Amino acid sequence: MSNLSRRNFVKGAGLASAAVAASAAAVPALADEAATDVVYPEGLQASDFAESPVELAPITEFAAEYTYDVVVIGAGTGGVPAALSAVEEGATACCLQKESAPLSQGGTSTGIMLDESDEQGVMNHMQGFIEDCHWRADRGLARFYYDHSGETMRWMEVRSMEAGFPPYSIGEVTFEYEDGSKCTKRSNRFGPKPYTNNELINALAKLAEERGVDFYYSTPGVQLIQDESGAVTGVVGKTEAGEYIKFNATKGVIVSTGDYQNNQSLVERYCPDVKEFDRKQVGKTGDGILMTMAIGAGFVPVGHSHMMHDFDSGPMFNEPFLTVNENGERFMNEDAEFEQLNNELRYQPKPGWYSQIFDANYVDQVTEWGGRATDPEKLEIYMPDIEMDRSVESGAGVLEYLIDTHRCDTLEELAEALGIPADALIASVERYNELVDAGFDSDFGKKACYMKRIDTPPFYGIHKHIRVSALCAGMTVNANYQVTKIDGTVIPNLWATGFGAGQLCGLPDWSMYTGGMSAGHCMTSGRYCGIAAATGKYEPTTPITDEDVAAAGYDMDVIHGVK
């Protein structure tokens, strides 16, 4: 596939060699400013643009010009569904992508099944999410998710089957409340690892291209275009050769470029909690945030949510085993939520890195705590020193380059395997055992029921690496994902999706109240922004139903848990 699309809607002889004048209102805030004297949008500075392709100086000469109804910036979890949904509604659409291929993360996506729930149950579940977010959630965006995510999950099931990469597992859970109401959620799991949503979105992009979407790879969006009224009328893309392409959008532009975790300048000011942590993703430099702020959009207030975890080094996360840092020293009360461990880890010698330590009795201990431990044989899947077939066909479900679990006969050997000082680890275990025998954790106050001696070989260690998976806040939007100015007024014909849009959660640590909500809300906002841009309405012409899902080849009894 070439960098530019095979199908263009506006072509003119000699256009590639002729300069095309841009609208004088392309970047109103920078009118009359020389390129060498750029005025930065409120809240931004020069360093914010150092890692991003976004340009502030007005671009007025183009190598080519194309016109579509809908232009999507970013071919990811939100962008590809947006573009495909737009063409399904009869619009012409293209998608600009900074990378040479679509890019996505995660594996599970979840939606709320309105027709299998009742109104009170849905409200109860949504209220539970808002309370879990300590009342910091954006209720409007939450409502959008609850209203539209169920249909989106069904749409993804049908389209992914057509694309040749359906979920390997689909399951529903029904919550029943004391008032007699109920709410059902459905989760699609794409994989198993090493396959993820990335394979899904790449397959979906091929389907979208077959159905009329033009993709422009290695062509980032670098500047939004507006008319004299302030409405967005297009975007400027930049090719690998450094040429500017003008993409006119007669109905709207959808920004779906992801978060800003790889823009260290923005991170240090807007999410300094994570500035010392490693990042899981690449290329997420806040391009959409910068582009929209350049035409007057706001950035949601500081206090941005972040998603930080490690589900790859080993299979256990919330078990309150002894935990040590890279110096081999205990540093916390281990009775903590996994998604919040970063709050302790940011103060450690190597932020994000730690090891869980336990012994041969761990299965009985976890069972006593009310959990379900991974048995020793299955734990071996995560041990890099044990050779076995970990291919996707094996069903191992791991990313082999990230597994980091170890089993040794002595603590000295375990320390070497984990890469931490043996004397420090031994001292930490000895001190821990003393506290267990005393019946009171005078160092960190962990409950006595979670204090268990570590004295029976073999000894186990899981070397964990907490990194930034996502920064879950972006440009200001309203409850319909329309981008807004700092004063709250809508910028016409401009939408944004996913984590780059608003702040759904609001909690410093992304809420795990509904597993799969992160990818689910990216897909949902993408699909429905594509529909809205194409039709002006937030409802598909032909909503996908379970009858469509069944017709696509799924066993509905399995999905509904009947068998």
Where are these regions (language model features)?
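Extreme N-terminal leader/targeting segments of oxidoreductases
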Residues: S2-L4, N8-D69
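N-terminal Rossmann-like FAD-binding beta1-loop-alpha1 element of flavoenzymes
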Residues: V70-C94
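Conserved N-terminal glycine-rich FAD pyrophosphate-binding loop of Rossmann-like flavoproteins
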Residues: E99-Q120
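Glycine-rich active-site loop/strand segments that organize a redox cofactor
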Residues: M113-Y145
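Conserved redox-cofactor binding core of oxidoreductases
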Residues: D147-E243, Q264-S265, V436-T456
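A glycine-rich dinucleotide-binding beta-alpha-beta segment and adjacent secondary-structure elements
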Residues: Q223, A424-P508, M512
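Glycine-rich loop(s) and the adjacent beta-strand/alpha-helix scaffold that form part
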Residues: E240-E243, N248-F311, G515, A519-Y528
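An anion/pyrophosphate-binding glycine-rich loop and adjacent beta-alpha core
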Residues: I289, G298-A417
